[in-house]
């Protein structure tokens, strides 16, 4: 007995402990159910209203307190509002916690209501209830409800996903168990066919009672629409509104209404993009989402793990975005690749001759030639076949070890004769000197594709005597420009090389309608709108001869993980999460609970069948399919790429075996094909995991013949994906079988495992065509998968660590932006900006005259202290003094601005208010004129204070957006440039974190400076009017402002950037980042107004010693 087994025998395994924890809840539900079942139909619905009322009342005191604080905010001084808002935020958190306790209290009754409703719909064709206003509204648009007099008649059949569906489901005990797990914010792992969709109805119904909204997140729009239609009537019966965001256009009123529904269905991408769009909005009317309350993520492993390397990006055009070198440099790369192919073939034929020699030295030379051929083109089919022969791969690996000794000291001897070197495991391509010579050719500049040592050149320039500062600056600019041009050229060559040597059409991507579209390696589906990053996608477009898309700039970005982390409560469902439980806990603190099946699984999972070559393997697959079809069993064949699915299709057509193909090119009929995949003798070829969420139902004849047969044509890198394929068979206790066919030429085996298995096969004397099937082999393959999973987890975690840096910045910026947009907290933010600006002017200037100039430029004020005071007084006291004067000036100027605007506003509103909704007010800061749109009625009622608020809002939004966009670009450049730190034995992430803090500080300072400078100088341009002008003013037609503009999203592109590409995994080969001017790092830390006081009281500095200074 192992140590883990020993511990399990004492404490029980995790599954048992989870069951023990949840079982009392299930017992409570069962105890509450008989009372609920006694209620008539109206009583059942009334019970729901009773629960809603109970939950609302549970936090009524707290809500009243928060409302009272909000109502009195206008009477609080600007400087003190921050504390009031902090109190409001604290109460809002308390309300959420109170609601959670109330939900736990009503859970048994709420779950019983859902179960009883499901039972009544399954047992009755019609349910008659007293009609409510909600019923009458529904009856106008839904065909499953009709009104007769004062009665509403609900039918038990409706359209879901294009099919007429009769409700026939009632919750099992294990589904109640799953419902509790989801409500508790955990992941429920349930086997295929166990009714995950029905399980979700329990926690969705319960949490929707709060009125704060529940989001049900799915992986594709078909499932989102189908599930909202399928489960919707069960919720609507109890007066809960249901909608699906994927039915409506982004930024539309319909999309906003969908978010206001009690229950909102949608795809993960659309939820994420709506969040980004909301944070680019220019009016509160543009916002669609409300608070992130509770989300249930269907197929949670796919969203939180498979998509983990894929940030959502909204990008827009950049100046000169059409300029690119890909088409221009493509012929050079094609020449390079052709030359390498000739070289690789030559080395391979040399190796074949020399390895069979009796001379030991010649054998060594043969294995070196083989190693060179492998480094030249590792995917060469002839090479892969030769490596599968007895003893060949082991010999090549020994040769590799010789050259890898002492930190790759001799590796250049092996690779110098090549034009470029490919490392499959690192996903990298490196150009050699020989390759550079080939593409440079007869060029006048032999260093055309060689990056100069910019640091050394700049150092030489600094030490060069006899040059004026101006001449040095000119030379420096020329050096940096030359470096940037060469850097772009080298980068383009590298990306084109990757496109030609590491990315294959119909495997990693497909070309449809003149566009390169990425095929998701996990699902086999086309990832619409997703692009490889860093120019790789453009390189593939150039390779395929399609239009190379223009370069874009990121305007807003977030990873799905960081989006879903914003929810107050998050849970998920999947058939396979146990293998990734560690990652889900590490990153999201989500616990995986395995839900037992309702009936025992009867599927037979066989050991892997291993062959030496792919040819033998596919031949065996076809023979296996033929036998299963003859036995009358349906067969689902899982493949890892479009190319393999098309090849198997051709082989089956030659054998005259009828079949359906489901891959990235033929995905339109997915639901139909998968639904028919259970018919007797049906063969369905599908790329991995296609059809998730659609059950394959079997007829009695098929069950008698042995059920659905799953054939995997290759082991995937992830055990989870293999488990998902196996899980298609054996639903609800049905019979079935699964088996994987593997060859030593498969990518997983070739890269991670085949040397050990190959040596076993060599020792046992297996010949070509023979198959090995043994538990030891299956275990060895699983070990290889674990190795890859660990590597992929490392990559995902690393990328998340990079995004976490940006996420902290994004949270700060988007919070400030939302304050400006909504207007409620804008005054508080401006006060803090003025304080920061005052403190910075005192802190950053050692000279009195410089300090005076700084205050004049940014705060438009004279220094409120003498030179002597500046030298002798404490800095914090000077800052406080400056701040008091600045705030007084700011209040005086804003009051003056309102006074000047008010007569005009009053006149227009009283004479022409019925004609105009908004008015444009011209305001200038002395440098630029701003036309500020303001609501006429609000301006009139507030005596033009609304004009000031609109001015502040417009300026703050403009400055934040421009600064954040620039910061994103700099962070992007920084991320690439820090990779070079690994060559200096430094951690690039650490350097990134340190440098990004400096960038962020610079951005915040820039936002503060620009905002304060414009607001402090803002005034309505007026001149003393003549009598004629006064008379004309009385007759002037007022210029009407257009209705407040909606954000036009059409110029932006939404995309999912694929971070699972070589650029993100391998260290960047050159520093592409332009030199950025850095502020000196200051050792001493200044205490901000809102920082904790250094005295240790726990109060904010401004309320403690900051006030006493």
Swiss-Prot record:
UniProt feature, compositional bias: Basic and acidic residues: 1045-1059, 1071-1088
Keywords: ATP-binding, Cell inner membrane, Cell membrane, Cytoplasm, Membrane, Metal-binding, Nucleotide-binding, Protein transport, Translocase, Translocation, Transport, Zinc
GO cellular component terms listed in the entry, alphabetical order: cell envelope Sec protein transport complex; cytosol; plasma membrane
Chain sites annotated for binding ATP: 175, 193-197, 695
Note on how the cofactor is bound: May bind 1 zinc ion per subunit.
Record PROSITE patterns: SECA, SECA_MOTOR_DEAD
Region (Disordered): 1038-1109
Name of the molecule in the record: Protein translocase subunit SecA
């Amino acid at each position: 007995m192992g140590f883990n087994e020993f511990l399990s025998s004492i404490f029980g395994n995790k599954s048992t402990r989870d069951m023990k924890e949840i079982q009392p809840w299930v017992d409570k539900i069962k105890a509450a159910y008989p009372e609920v079942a006694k209620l008539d139909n109206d009583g059942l619905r009334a019970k729901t209203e009773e629960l809603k009322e109970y939950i609302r009342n549970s936090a009524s005191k707290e809500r009243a307190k928060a409302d009272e604080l909000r109502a009195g905010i206008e009477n609080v001084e600007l400087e003190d509002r921050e504390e009031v808002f902090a109190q409001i935020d604290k109460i809002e958190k308390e309300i959420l916690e109170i609601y959670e306790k109330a939900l736990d209290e009503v859970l048994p009754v709420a779950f019983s209501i859902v179960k009883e409703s499901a039972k009544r719909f399954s047992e009755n064709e019609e349910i008659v209830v007293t009609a409510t206003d909600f019923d009458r509204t529904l009856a106008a648009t839904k065909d499953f409800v009709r009104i007769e007099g004062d009665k509403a008649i609900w039918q038990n059949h409706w359209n879901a996903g294009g099919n007429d569906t009769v409700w026939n489901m009632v919750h099992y005990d294990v589904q109640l168990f799953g419902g509790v797990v989801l409500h508790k914010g955990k992941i429920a792992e349930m086997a295929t066919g166990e009714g995950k969709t029905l399980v979700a109805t329990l926690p969705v119904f319960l949490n929707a009672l709060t009125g704060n909204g529940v989001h049900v997140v799915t992986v594709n729009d078909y499932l989102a629409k189908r599930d909202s239609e399928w489960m919707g009537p069960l919720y609507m019966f109890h007066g809960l509104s249901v909608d699906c965001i994927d039915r409506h256009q982004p930024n539309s009123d319909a999309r906003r209404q969908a978010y206001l529904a009690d229950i909102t269905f949608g795809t993960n991408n659309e939820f994420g993009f709506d969040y980004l769009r909301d944070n680019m909005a220019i009016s509160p009317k543009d916002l669609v989402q409300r608070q992130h309350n509770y989300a249930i993520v269907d197929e949670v492993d796919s969203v939180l793990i498979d998509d983990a390397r894929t940030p959502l990006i909204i990008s827009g055009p950049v100046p000169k975005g059409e300029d690119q070198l890909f088409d221009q440099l493509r012929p050079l790369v094609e020449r390079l690749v052709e030359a390498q192919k000739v070289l690789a073939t030559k080395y391979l034929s040399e190796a074949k001759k020399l390895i069979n020699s009796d001379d030991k030295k010649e054998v060594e030379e043969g294995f070196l030639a083989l190693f060179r051929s492998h480094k030249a083109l590792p995917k060469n089919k002839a090479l892969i076949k030769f490596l599968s022969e007895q003893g060949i791969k082991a010999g090549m690996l020994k040769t590799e070890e010789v050259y890898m000794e002492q930190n790759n000291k001799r590796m250049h001897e092996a690779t110098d004769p090549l034009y470029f070197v490919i490392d499959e495991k690192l996903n990298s391509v490196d150009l050699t000197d020989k390759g550079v010579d080939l593409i440079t050719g007869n060029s006048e500049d032999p260093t055309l594709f060689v990056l100069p040592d910019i640091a050394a050149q700049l150092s030489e320039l600094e030490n060069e005597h006899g040059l004026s500062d101006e001449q040095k600056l000119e030379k420096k600019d020329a050096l940096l420009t030359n470096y940037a041009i060469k850097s772009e050229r080298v980068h383009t060559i590298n990306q084109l090389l990757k496109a030609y040597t590491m990315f294959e059409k119909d495997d990693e991507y497909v070309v449809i309608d003149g566009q390169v579209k990425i095929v998701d390696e996990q699902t086999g589906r086309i990832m619409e709108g997703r692009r490889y990053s860093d120019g790789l996608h453009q390189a593939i477009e150039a390779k395929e001869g399609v239009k190379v898309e223009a370069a874009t700039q990121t305007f807003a970005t977030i990873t799905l993980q960081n989006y879903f982390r914003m929810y107050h409560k998050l849970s998920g469902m999947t058939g396979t999460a146990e293998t990734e439980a560690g990652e889900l806990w590490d990153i999201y603190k989500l616990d995986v609970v395995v839900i037992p099946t309702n009936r025992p699984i009867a599927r037979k999972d066989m050991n892997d069948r291993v062959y030496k070559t792919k040819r033998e393997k596919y031949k065996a697959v076809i023979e296996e399919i033929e036998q299963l079809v003859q036995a009358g069993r349906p067969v689902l064949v899982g493949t890892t790429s479009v190319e393999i699915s098309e090849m198997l299709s051709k082989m089956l057509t030659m054998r005259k075996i009828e079949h359906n193909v489901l891959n990235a090119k033929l995905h339109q009929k997915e639901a139909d094909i998968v639904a028919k995949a259970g018919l007797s003798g049906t063969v369905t070829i599908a790329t991995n995991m296609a059809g998730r969420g659609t059950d394959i139902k079997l007829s009695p004849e098929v069950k008698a013949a042995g059920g659905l047969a799953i054939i995997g044509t290759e082991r995937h890198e992830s055990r989870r994906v293999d488990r998902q394929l196996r899980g298609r068979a054996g639903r609800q206790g049905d019979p079935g079988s699964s088996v994987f066919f593997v060859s030593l030429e498969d990518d997983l085996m070739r890269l991670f495992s085949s040397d050990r298995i190959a040596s076993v096969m060599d020792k046992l004397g297996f010949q070509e065509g023979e198959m090995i099937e043994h538990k030891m082999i299956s275990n060895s393959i699983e070990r290889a998968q674990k190795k890859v999973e660990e590597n992929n987890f490392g990559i995902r975690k690393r990328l998340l660590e990079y995004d976490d840096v940006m996420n902290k910045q994004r949270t700060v910026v988007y919070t400030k932006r939302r304050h400006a947009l909504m207007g409620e907290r804008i005054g508080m933010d401006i006060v803090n900006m003025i304080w920061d600006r005052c403190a910075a002017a005192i802190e950053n200037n050692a000279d009195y005259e410089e300090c005076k100039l700084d205050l004049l430029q940014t705060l438009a004020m004279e220094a409120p202290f003498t030179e002597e005071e500046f030298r002798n007084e404490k800095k914090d006291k000077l800052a406080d003094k400056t701040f008091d004067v600045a705030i007084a000036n700011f209040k005086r100027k804003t009051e003056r601005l309102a006074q000047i605007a008010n007569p005009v506003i009053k006149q227009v509103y009283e004479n022409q208010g019925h004609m105009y909704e908004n008015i444009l007010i011209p305001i200038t800061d002395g440098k630029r004129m701003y036309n500020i749109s303001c609501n006429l009625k609000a301006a009139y009622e507030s005596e033009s204070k609304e004009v000031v608020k609109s001015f502040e809002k417009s300026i703050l939004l403009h400055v934040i957006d421009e600064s954040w966009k620039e910061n994103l670009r700099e962070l992007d450049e920084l991320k690439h440039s820090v990779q070079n730190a690994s060559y200096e034995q430094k951690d690039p992430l650490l350097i990134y974190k340190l440098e990004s803090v400096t960038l962020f500080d610079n951005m915040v300072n820039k936002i503060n400076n620009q905002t304060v400078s414009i607001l402090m100088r803002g005034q309505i341009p007026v001149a003393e009017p003549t009598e004629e002008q006064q008379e004309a003013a009385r007759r002037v037609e007022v210029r009407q402002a257009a209705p407040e503009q909606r954000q036009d999203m059409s110029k932006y592109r939404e995309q999912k950037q694929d971070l699972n590409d070589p650029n993100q995994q391998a260290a960047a080969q050159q520093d592409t980042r332009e030199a950025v001017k850095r502020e000196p790092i200051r050792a001493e830390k200044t205490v901000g107004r809102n920082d904790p006081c250094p005295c240790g009281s726990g109060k904010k500095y401004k309320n403690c010693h900051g006030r006493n200074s």
